From Swiss-Prot:
It catalyses: L-methionyl-[protein] + [thioredoxin]-disulfide + H2O = L-methionyl-(S)-S-oxide-[protein] + [thioredoxin]-dithiol; [thioredoxin]-disulfide + L-methionine + H2O = L-methionine (S)-S-oxide + [thioredoxin]-dithiol. Keywords: Oxidoreductase. It comes from the Archaea. This is Peptide methionine sulfoxide reductase MsrA. Pfam families: PMSR. One of its GO terms (molecular function) is L-methionine:thioredoxin-disulfide S-oxidoreductase activity. Has an important function as a repair enzyme for proteins that have been inactivated by oxidation. Catalyzes the reversible oxidation-reduction of methionine sulfoxide in proteins to methionine. InterPro entries: Met_Sox_Rdtase_MsrA_dom, Met_Sox_Rdtase_MsrA_sf. It comes from Natronomonas pharaonis (strain ATCC 35678 / DSM 2160 / CIP 103997 / JCM 8858 / NBRC 14720 / NCIMB 2260 / Gabara). The active site is at 11. Its EC number is 1.8.4.11.
Amino acid sequence: MTATATLGGGCFWCVEAAFEELDGVESVTSGYAGGHTEDPTYREVCSGNTGHAEVVQVAYDSDVLAYEDLLEVFFTVHDPTQLNRQGPDVGSQYRSIVLYHDDTQRELAEAYIESLDEAGEYDDDIVTEIERLETFYRAEENHQNYFEKNPQDAYCRMHAQPKIETVREAFAEKVDSR
């Protein structure tokens, strides 16, 4: 059965590339959500005035992957303790955010963060926002499958490639062998 998750953990090019590695992921779409501007553009989101975050919407086969699996990958490939930034990318559009589609996703996200806190996984507080998804706006076409189309891009080699390698190593049993 196809299910959907919407997550933001920094630059969507990098997060998209990481999730595309997983068996059971049917598609990953880069976009914007969590803000107040209707149908925003990349330039508008980058201005920091729309309230939106760069996010990915992951369509996945819930018979192959659980929502909790996606959360585990998500919290492994980005730093949820960085407020309004990820690495060199600074601004609220790069914030850590889980946009839930239903109460079950909300409860699972809250429980997952609580388990990370209890386990002392991070030295700093987790600042990941958990909000109901109101509207997802698909990003412009040049942002879709960006790493796949631009594997030699210096930014992607420096930031997306390590996320991909992390997924391949830490989640080898879940990586798509296509």
